[in-house]
């Protein structure tokens, strides 16, 4: 529990007493108990406030360093992807349309779909 920033005394609480961020950290703690080398994280920060998202991302980064974890990080949130990922795979309609190093894909997308996606995300984030 300490690895994910939670107190041990939380084990005495009921499920409905936890916030969304605490629930997410508990799910992460349950996953690392098995000492995995690879974890699939499907929208691990969705439905969380931005400040809680940042806390969860920090927990994931610390755990990745401490336990030498590899993540398959699935998300629609490009800010979170950019902060978490070394490599990016962009999919459209269930098909891979572009992949590469994160900086390269964000700074110089090759595919039209990726270019439109990044423009839309930039436009949305500036509003």
Can you name each region flagged by the protein language model?
Residues 28, 56:
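Hydrophobic anchor residue at the start of the ABC signature
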Residues 81-83:
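A short, surface-exposed alpha-helical micro-motif characterized by mixed small hydrophobic
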Residues 14-18, 22:
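Conserved ABC ATPase signature
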């Amino acid at each position: 529990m300490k690895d994910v920033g939670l107190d041990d005394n939380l084990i005495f609480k009921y499920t409905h007493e936890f916030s969304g961020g605490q629930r997410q950290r508990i799910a992460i703690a349950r996953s690392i108990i098995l000492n995995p080398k690879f974890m699939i994280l499907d929208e691990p920060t969705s439905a969380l406030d931005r400040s809680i998202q940042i806390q969860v991302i920090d927990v994931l980064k610390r755990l990745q360093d401490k336990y030498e974890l590899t993540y398959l990080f699935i998300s629609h949130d490009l800010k979170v992807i950019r902060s978490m990922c070394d490599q990016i795979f962009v999919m459209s309609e269930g098909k891979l349309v572009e992949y590469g190093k994160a900086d390269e894909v964000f700074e110089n997308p090759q595919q039209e779909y990726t270019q439109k996606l990044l423009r839309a995300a930039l436009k949305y984030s500036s509003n």
